[in-house]
Structures are given as C-alpha cells and as structure tokens.
Amino acid sequence: MNQNIFVVYPSGKLGDFIWHMPFIRHISNISKREIILITRESTSAKAILADENYIEDIYYIPFKKGFFNYIKEILYMQKLFKTLDAKEVWILDKISRPAIAARVANVKTINGFGVTNQSLWITNKNQLEKKDLKIHYIERSNKFFNQMNYPINYKFININVDESLLETSRNQLSPNNEKIITYGIDSSEMWRSWPKEYFIELILKINKKDNYKHILLASPKNAYLADEIINEISDKNILNYAHLGIKDIMPILKVSSMYIGNDSGILNLSAAIGTKSIGIFGATKSFDYSDNIIPAIAKDGEISTTTDRLLDNKGKTIEDPKLAYRVKPNDVFEKFIENILF
C-alpha cells in the first residue's frame, strides 16, 4: 500500500476552510500526491472538493469538547492513520488530538503549529509563537509554511464546479439568458448581518436599473428572512433558495452575474467559484485576499484598522447588531453599478 499524506483542519467554519484550501493544496504539491483530509462536516468539504484533483479522500470528525470525546477521537484517528499507512500528518491548527493519535500510530512525520501542548507531540522543530495566534488565519499559516521552509505564494483558491450541475442550473434559472443576482442574507453570527430592510431597499434600486432574477440564500433556520423580503417586494423574479445545501448552491453561484452578501462563508465560496462578489463589511473589517471580492464599506471607513472586528477594552468582540447598519444600501448599490456588466 502507498503511504498516505494526511491534512487535519479542525475548524468548522466554511469561510475559514476556504481560506485554508490553498494551504491544503500546497501540501499536496509539496508531497507530489493527493492528500487525505480530516475536517468537520460543517465545512461541507466533500461537496466543495468533489471535483478537485489533489484530494484522495475526506473524513469527517466532530472535534467535540470533553474528555471522553477527546479519547474517542484520538482512537479513531489513530486507527485511521494506522489502517491507511500514514507517512505524514499535517495539522493546520494548534490542537493536540491529531498529533497524539499520529504519535500512537507511529507516524514518523507530524507537522503542526505547536504553541500549546501540541508541541509535545509534533516532530517539526520550527513552530509558531503564542503571539501568532492573534494574527489572521492566512498570515498565521503563511508564517508556518515559511518556517517549515515550504514558502507559499498565497493565492485565493479557484474551486471547480461539475459541468452537469452548471448546465442544470442554467436551464432551470436562466433558460432565456436571464441575468441572476444571488444574495447571502444571513450569517453564522447574526449580529453582523445586514438588516432585511436594507436588502429590500437594495433590490428595489437594482430593479429600477434593469431586470434581474434575484435569488436569496440563507441557512434553513433563517429562511423566514427570505420570505419576509419576498413578501415586502412582491416580485415573481425573487426566489427563496434557503433550503439548499452547499452542493446545490455552488452551481447557482457560478451562473450568477453577481453575488451580494454579508461577510460570511458563502461570500468566500462565491469568490472562490469565480463570481464577482460584493461583501458587506459593516461590522467587520474588509479583506483583499481575492480579486473577486468587492468590499462595500461604510462612508466613515473600516470598523477597525488593527483587528478584523471591533473589540472592547478586554479584547472581546463587541457584538452589536447596529454595526452592520453602518453600510447603507446606496453604498452597496454604488459598488454594484461600478462592477456589473449591463
């Protein structure tokens, strides 16, 4: 059996996972082989990476807190590493469980960030410092690979979408070449989500400019927001697609003329698929890691110049829903006019 390369990415946030995909591919390039990924199901990695040629297989682990969960997950990963003959394990995080499992499985090369108790189990000597945990995820991983003597020229990932799914979406949504705008109307942290009244005002402004089909995306628990927006506008060309999973959302994003939405995982996914995407950054600081992301910020500037969100005197995030109101509908509409092709 060929020895395998494992990458463990334990975070469950979609946007963070997409930010880390270039690093996962980089490990595949370093190793000159496909990799086996271990991550959380909430990343939707199996759907997102279905058409990528640097992935051999994907395993989901919940990475739950609690002593018994720790033991259960260590034993599961240890068996996985042993059964699939792991040659190397890369851990793109500071947690110890994968490193312990790899040690017990007698994996010779275990690379991780270090910093915490993980440093007792990994084999790489060049590790990150505690202060590195405060910098952005991308900068942190960039530093890690530089210290490992595997520098990366970081470029935002391009995700492939199955052609048959694209064709189905085109036929269903745009049989007569209708122009589509997709909206991400919620967020995993709703305090930083744009209010529905602003989405309504924006859609009405866009409708005055040209005819578009508007598709509203949200998590199923926030589907009611899409219904409320549709009820206010009463336009047959506005559709509630909040019931869809990532696999079905991806081709819709790809066939859209533009995506407009909150700073969220779907914004990153849309940009990675190749769609021009306006990100609404009222409660969070904008970023420029992708040419496809067009930041819409408040007239009075970024929420912060030093951190990605506003912090109080104790360093805790200020979760004030009013911060999202800083970006007005006209701020987003101006970005739309500047970047859409009529």
Predicted regions: what they are:
Residues 1-342:
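Catalytic machinery of carbohydrate-active enzymes
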